[in-house]
Amino acid sequence: MRCNFKGLTLTELLIASFIFLLCTSTVISVWLCVRKIYTVDITTIDSRRELRTALHRMNSDFKMAETIYTGRSFIYKGRTYQIPPDPLYPGSPGYSIAVAIPVIDSDGIRSGNYTITGYFLEGQSNPDKYNPGAQQLVRFCYNTTGGTQANPVNPLSVNLQTVITSSDTNFTVLAHYIEPQGLEFTVFDPPRGIKTAAVKVERKLANLPPVQQKIESGYFMRNNR
């Protein structure tokens, strides 16, 4: 018995439908595999580029800085951040740092105000299943007011807690996927007056083979002012 459907027999229609479904499933499977590979590779590349960009940004801030704050602390979202050196543990690293950068006007003259810039780690805004305990590097920026060329602001008088809680402070996430203990700030103040800050960053990638799971880079920043 023949069953015609627009010129096709029932058998031919079933065969055509099977071939169509097979081709469709194959295309979808290939697309999903390629998408997964592409996502993993791009994520890895972007994280490294993001980290390099963040470290260069930090280095630029420290080069322009006139003051590196030491022995300070502040509270952000219920967590206390200690800026080294800790009075209780001299020489120990911290997980935050802040500097004061003089504001220069369009004529290249100091305005008397400062940009207070700092960095710290906090939990990820969007947790990643591959790195559930990962942290993100945050940069905060605040501009002082009221300073003049004749009567400039004293950067050492700035209260970092006030800076953190001010509505005028901008917070920017510069790097994601940093291990909880993967970033350390160490501030040195030798007799010759050169202040330096050493940063160590380490990240584990759960989506790479064990031998490649750890990305570690050291960065040494110096301020000669």
Regions found by a protein language model. Name each.
Residues 1-3:
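N-terminal secretory signal peptides that target proteins for export/translocation
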Residues 5-64:
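Aliphatic-rich helix starts adjacent to a transmembrane/signal segment
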Residues 144-150, 202-225:
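Low-complexity, S/T/G/P-rich flexible repeat/linker segments used as non-globular hinges
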Residues 193-202:
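A short hydrophobic beta-strand element
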